[in-house]
Amino acid sequence: MAFRMLLMGLPGSGKTTLMRTLAGQYRFAAGKLQVGVTVKAAFLSQHLQELDPSWRVLEAVEKVALHVELGGGREISASQLCERLGFDYEGQQRMVRDLSGGEKRRLQLTRLLMDSPNVLLLDEPTNDFDVETLTALEDLLDTYAGVLIV
């Protein structure tokens, strides 16, 4: 079942802290977080994760999985997901070390999606994206069958 939640607040109001807590990166000072056994969460932070600079884009994605199910029985390859997020054939052959900040963020998101999460936590997901990438991301997330928290 698809569910969407938008977190809004002033800078410093705790949006990122809440997301990191939900992703299991922070501990509660009090209380507890109970996660169901079928929950598979993925967190896209504002900060770029280090990726091996010697990898090619497609290689970095295929290290997670070769295929991913998008829901409704639809399955696509790592290469097809790369294309949906703006990495054409030439882009998939580029070295990670040669990517811009926005391209690395796009690659990070692609890798998260390849892991088949049913809960996506996206902290300021549009940072560093151009209009074309934003449109592709919006189209992809519109069809996302899981829980989406932005």
Residue ranges and their predicted role:
Residues M1-V150:
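ABC ATP-binding cassette signature C-motif
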